[in-house]
């Protein structure tokens, strides 16, 4: 434990943060059973994003965990995910915290239905910026929409009689087609 304290103190100094903030950020990653090296990488990204967003490291570590657990496939750096949220927060009337908090609500279902991280983050930032609804409201609404489409994608008819065909017709009226030429449902990124 004393070795961890020394290492955490050194890492915190290098990142211009407190040892307490560093350990708060790393706790969730250790609880996930990650290696020391992986915890150090994730904690560094977490501390940097927390500093940029003006948010606590504990909150940011929870938010990034939801994003990484659902979108990270090794093809991009861990830092990339934080950079996208920070850039979108700077470019829109949304904040990094709003984007991360909203993504936390629907990340698990977003990837399942073919929604990329970039589109998920962009959709959330756009809706939050334009409506000024909270990230909880927007994230939960997107989760509900995606869950319904996923269920319908599997052939289910909802208790209110809603079917994929009904959704398809409503979207077609506003010029959005959800089907590929071969009849398969498009990935969410393409819809």
Residue locations for each model-derived region?
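Active-site capping/gating regions of soluble enzymes
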Residues: 121
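Glycine/charged-rich beta-loop-alpha catalytic/anionic-binding loops adjacent to active sites
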Residues: 103
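Intrinsically disordered, low-complexity polar regions and short flexible loop motifs
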Residues: 189
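Short edge-strand/loop segments of extracellular domains
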Residues: 145-149
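Extracytoplasmic, non-cytosolic globular domains
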Residues: 124-129
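A short, structural motif
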Residues: 1-83, 87-100, 110-118, 130-139, ...
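Conserved catalytic-loop aspartate of Hanks-type protein kinases
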Residues: 142
